[in-house]
C-alpha cells in the first residue's frame, strides 16, 4: 500500500514539515509494510516559502532590503532546483513589503513602496534563478509595482525627464516609462505570480477600494489612490502597449499583479496551482492507495484554492480516498466531502484552551493520526 502524507501547516503551531513527519511516523506504526511518501504542501499563503524549501531541499536565504517605509529590513527568500533541474527563486512580497512589517499607526499607502520586493528579485537572479515564483499576499503597498520596477532599473519620468518619487499622489506627474536601464539579466527570467484574487486594478472592486482600508486609507484617500492607479494603468497601455486595467488579479497587492504583468511579462495563477506544478504532485500521487492531508482548521474557506482540498481533488481524479486531520472544524467543514476529503477528524479531544491546544499540537496530532489510521486498518479487515 502506498500512502501519501501531505498536510499544510497548522497555523500558529506546526509547520507543514513537522506535521508531515508526525503523521508519517504514525502511519509507519500502523502500516509498517507500506510505502510512505511525505509531501509538505502549501497554497501560496503564509509559510509557503519554508514549505517549498523543505520539500525541495532548497536553500533559505536572507537579504537586507528596503521595507515598505524605506527603512531596512532583513527579508527571507529561497532558491531551489526543480525536478527538471531548473533553478527557481521563491519570494513572498510580504517579507519585504508587507503589512506585518509596519505598526498600525505607520500604515501609509501613499508612501509605502514595493522596492524591497524588487531587490529580492535581483538577489534571486544574482544567485542563478532562471524562474521566479512570487507570492503577493499581505502587502502594505498600493503602488502598482512601481517600487519593484524602480528596483530593477525602470524609470518613471516627468515632463522634464526627471524621476518622479514614490509617493502615489505624485504618480499623475509621470509622463513616460523608460526601460533603457532595465536590468538585462531579467529579460529571460520567467515569472509566475501566486494570485488568488480576481480583483481588477481600479474601480469599486479594485485594489484601492477593496484593500485600501486595511492599509490605512480613509474614504477620500481611497478615491485618490484609485484615480492614480487608473492614471498609471492608462500610461502603461500608452507606453508599453499592455492593457492592465482589465486583468483579473491585476488589483492584487495594491496593483502589483498588474505591474508584474506589465513590467515582467508575469503569469498570474492560483498559488496552489503553481506550487503543485512546481512539486510535480500529481505525478507523485496518482498510484497511491491513500492520501492523508490536514491544516489548522477545516471550514468553508478550505474549499477556496486551499492545498488540502486541491490534493483531495487530485486523489478523487485517480479514485484515491483522502482523509483529513485539522486543528478544529469551522462552519461548512462538511462541504469538504464533495471535494474528496471523505473522513475528517480534529486534534481537539477534550475541553481545553486555544493556547493549550497550540502548545500541545504535536501530541494532539499524533493521537488524532493514530486513531484515524487504526480505524482505516479495522475497515480494511472487515
Regions found by a protein language model. Give the residues of each.
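N-terminal loops that bind phosphate or other acidic moieties
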Residues: 2-136, 140-382
